[in-house]
């Protein structure tokens, strides 16, 4: 809801909107300085505030749904635990151009928001890491970053080792490591296994021979490593995801950033 327009019962409407009977206090809830005219209350809304704790498999559609529930009212998201997107293909936090709010305030309280890590390749390139924030509302998105914003690390490159040209007669699919965080490991067919990324580190590539290895996954904001070997098909690692992609927000505090940003 919002305070009614002029003409209308602005005083009672402002009290219902803000929960404040004193108009000086209602003005504060509506982000107006005192003194002010009550007519300035018309059409304004109090901030809608949400707080989120840790979730390592988070669907960013939740943010979008809360924005549309609030209508044109300004909305505040307080992040108090590490958040990781559920998919490398979906940004953790996305504000498309049709977002209706007066502004969107994102406060990060000493924690990290992550795009998901890219997958390691299986006789193929590593996939790109996921973006953390996609912003298409320009300065209406206000970011106060008291923690970190991290693009997902790229997946490591895989390959195919044709060992028959050496003194061995085996052929191996070589897998790349998953990017940080939680990028899946690439497939492999021999030697030490490739590993997935975790919240705290990137995965490593498989290793079928002393000089043959899949690329390691990238750390947050970094590309994955390339396949290393002397024969067979060799592929590169995936690119890092963006910390913030799209249009530039209003940066109230940039904080720690891992990966490209606008």
Swiss-Prot record:
Q: What domain of life?
A: Viruses
Motif GRM 2 boundaries? 124-131
Q: Where is this motif: GRM 9?
A: 222-227
Q: Which residues form the signal peptide?
A: none
Which Pfam families does this UniProt record tie to the protein? GP38 (PF05268), Gp38_N (PF21721)
Chain ranges for the short sequence motif GRM 1 as given in the UniProt record = 115-122
Q: Where in the cell is it found?
A: Virion
GO-annotated biological processes: adhesion receptor-mediated virion attachment to host cell; symbiont entry into host cell
Q: Which UniProt keywords apply?
A: Host-virus interaction, Viral attachment to host cell, Viral tail fiber protein, Viral tail protein, Virion, Virus entry into host cell
- DNA-binding keyword on record: no
Q: Where is the motif GRM 6 annotated in this sequence?
A: 188-194
Comment, domains: The N-terminus is involved in binding to the fiber protein p37. The C-terminus contains glycine-rich motifs (GRM) and mediates the host specificity. The glycine-rich motifs assemble into a 3-layered PG(II) sandwich domain.
Q: What does this protein do?
A: Receptor binding protein (RBP) that is at the tip of the long tail fibers and serves as the phage recognition site for the attachment host receptor. Probably uses the host receptor OmpA.
Quote the protein name from its UniProt record.
Receptor-recognizing protein gp38
Q: In which organism is this protein found? A: Enterobacteria phage M1
